Amino acid sequence: MITGIGCDVVELERIEKVLQRHEKAFLEKVLSSSELETYHKRKAGNSKRGLAFAASRWAAKEAFSKALGTGIRDQVRLTDISVKNNELGAPYLVFSGELKELVQEMGLDCFISLSDTDKVCMAVAVCERKNNG
């Protein structure tokens, strides 16, 4: 049974301005350690790819927090959410810390879809209760 759906759209220009002013603080607040490493690799290759990566992770985490129904607070820390990609490039969510425990206690499977243009990144997240029987 679906327990929540969340959506977030972020303008790349907005994230670009934040990164210009507060790159280190923003990235350390938003990205997990593995995502931070990926961000720097992508940015080194092409600054636009780094920007799109940071924006898509922000959108994904906001969308997930909406699907969970809590927003970003208490046990939901941005750095405890990682967006990974499978071998075909499809994104999926990995949780750590208290958030991992919360998602397990709630019996949830959570899914994410990302899309972007040259101006915006968007994410849609769905949480559903696992069928245990």
Language-model segment annotations:
Residues 1-133:
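Core catalytic alpha/beta fold that binds nucleotide/phospho-ligands
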